[in-house]
Amino acid sequence: MRPHAGKIALFLVFALFAVGIGGCSSHTFVQTEPSLILGAKELSGYIGKDGVVIVDTRSADEYAAGHVQGAVNIPTEDIVINVPVKNMLTSQKKIEKVMGSNGISNSTMVIAYDSNKMGASRLLWTLFMYGHRDVKVVDGGFNALSACNLTLSTESVSPQEAVFTAREPASNWLATQEEVLAQVNAPDDNRILLDVRSMEEYYEVGKVPTSVMMDYNTNFFSGDQTFKTTDITKINYMEEGIFPENEIILYCQTSLRAAPVFVQLYEAGYRNIRIYDGAYLEWSSNSGNPIEMPAGSAAPAAKDAS
């Protein structure tokens, strides 16, 4: 937790409840944009709807075993490249090809689901990066859809080809290794490096110096793995001294776990959020980058792959 963050957050929590969440607090966010998160029960209303493409981001084998009727399959591997490190943002040209071949145009609403809490959000962030904002992720993913007794299909889908034009990558959603290093060397109090890996990973392999640790799992309810409510999210992050007016740079091991945190923070009103796409894998691979280890911990050893 950042210095004095707990006392500040506690005060703000009382203030929020005193005026009511959505009242006049300077830290209150009023949702004016469509939600990025779609309840599993709501998906049935979009199946077969014109202008909507439902995307299953699971593996081809999982898709073949049963998927939402009419859903196309875009596994995460189709929207990333492994250069210079694993799971980097793929090219403009590749995104245009993948989206177009799956019937997605610039006017299409995309609704994505996964089974790992990461794939759908990574697709959302990727589309944001290339200028497409009409995207939603299904809360709770495939497990939540299965619990709704939604009719599944094992038939593959052959969508009509569409034209998708990707814009130049949006720098406001992306952070580079150089920018992270600049923050380490000359910290800006308004900028926060947010490490969403587990504390176990920190103890085993270290972290980027000055970064705040907050496991991405804290954004989900432990039972059904759905996103926590916006109000709970605001309080959780304020308790760590992370406010909507801060500039936040997210990272994990390969930037997959950072994606659902991006979605949840955006949903809670945070707009100055970027993902360090090279993530800790790139950072720790560069011998010139400093690494912060907890006192008394063992030497770094490679661990998680996401």
What is each stretch, according to the model?
Residues 235, 240-296:
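C-terminal soluble interaction/assembly domains
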Residues 29-107, 181-245:
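Positively charged, proline/Ser/Thr-rich regional signature most characteristic
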